Each structure stands twice: as C-alpha cells, then as structure tokens.
Amino acid sequence: MVKSPLKALVISLVFLFVLGFLFPTVTSLITEKALPNQSEGQPIKIDGKVYGSYLLAEAFNSSIFFHPRPSAIGYNLSESGSYPYSLGNPEVLNLTEKYLDEFLKDNPGINASQIPYAMLSYSASGLDPNIPLQGALIQIPRISIALHSITNNSVSLWENYLNDLVNKYTTQNFPFFGSYYVNIMYLNVNILEYLMNNGYIKSLNSIPP
C-alpha cells in the first residue's frame, strides 16, 4: 500500500504515460511498419487515389462485377446497420423473396437451390465485403459474358481468369472446419484494374451497366 500521496501521484503519472501514450504509440509504429496496408484500413487505391476500403462492401451494380450481399443501408459507408426485424417477422420473408428474384434476374441460368442464403440476406453491418465461395462461383458465367462483350477475350478465357481470381482470394473463416468465403472488393478491383490497364475502360465513369 502506498502511503505517500506524492508517491501515489508519481506512480499514477508513470502508468498514465506508459499505458496512455508510450504503449499505443509504439504499437502503432510497429503496426505501420509491419502491416502498412492493414494499419491504414486497407484502402483501395486506383491511379494514386483512394476510392474506399477492402474491408467495406460497395454497390457494384454493373454486370461485369461480382455483386455483394444485400445491404439495408444501401452500402452507405458513413453508417452501418440492418433492418430492425426479427427472423419471425413476415417482412424478412418478403425481403428474401425480393433478393432472390433480383439475383435470379441478374444471373440467368442458375437455380434458386444453387444460391447460398447469405446472398439473399443482409449482413448485420450492411457493409460486409465477404460472400460465400458458392455465391462467387455462380456469378462467374454472367460476368464472363459481360466481360466478353466489351473485350476481345472469349467467354471461356474469362471464366478461367475469374475462377483463378476467386481461388486466389478464397479464405476460410476457421481452419479445417470453417466455411469458405471470398472478398468481392479484391475481385472487383482486380477486374477493374485489368480493364483499365488494357484500355477497355478509360475511367471509372465509363464502366458499363
């Protein structure tokens, strides 16, 4: 037990300095050096400009991109959240049917049984960039046809490219027993950079619908 008020004050100031300044500063500096991209929030940089983060989903509505999970907030990066409905609320079923119809319309040729439920349900944050592996694979035919229409590459060539891309960015949320998922932001940025680097798209404003 510290009896002297002066000693107690000194100890408090030392702990305040170490835990409130020194430790956070050292940790931040180490993180910036060891993981520079992660420490900055994994920003998406195109032509030297930041256009978002790989950690936050955005609305990729064009047919040449992988589509994310539904969002209750319209992918608004300034907020996060979901609908205030319980699972037993009839509105949840209505929304699921709506998302199912939209997904089938955007991806003709697939069956409803092929669609993972996560692709038909909104995430808790509304900004989840990860989708199930199956949710990415069933979008490849649609994307391949769309990319073929604006490039000289065949549909089969695009299918191979996209399959390799999905495999590259597929991760498992838990080792051995976890499910496989893929971050669509990495997939779509790769597609965008390929098209821009090869002259198929001049700028972000010239992305086809």
Swiss-Prot record:
Membrane-related topology note: Single-pass membrane protein
Subcellular location(s) per record: Cell membrane
Keywords: ATP-binding, Cell membrane, Ion transport, Membrane, Nucleotide-binding, Potassium, Potassium transport, Transmembrane, Transmembrane helix, Transport
GO cellular component, one term: plasma membrane
Pfam family name, one: KdpC
An annotated Gene Ontology molecular function: ATP binding
Entry's transmembrane regions: 10-30
PANTHER family: POTASSIUM-TRANSPORTING ATPASE C CHAIN (PTHR30042), POTASSIUM-TRANSPORTING ATPASE KDPC SUBUNIT (PTHR30042:SF2)
Family: Belongs to the KdpC family.
Function: Part of the high-affinity ATP-driven potassium transport (or Kdp) system, which catalyzes the hydrolysis of ATP coupled with the electrogenic transport of potassium into the cytoplasm. This subunit acts as a catalytic chaperone that increases the ATP-binding affinity of the ATP-hydrolyzing subunit KdpB by the formation of a transient KdpB/KdpC/ATP ternary complex.
Assembly notes: The system is composed of three essential subunits: KdpA, KdpB and KdpC.
Name this protein carries in UniProt: Potassium-transporting ATPase KdpC subunit
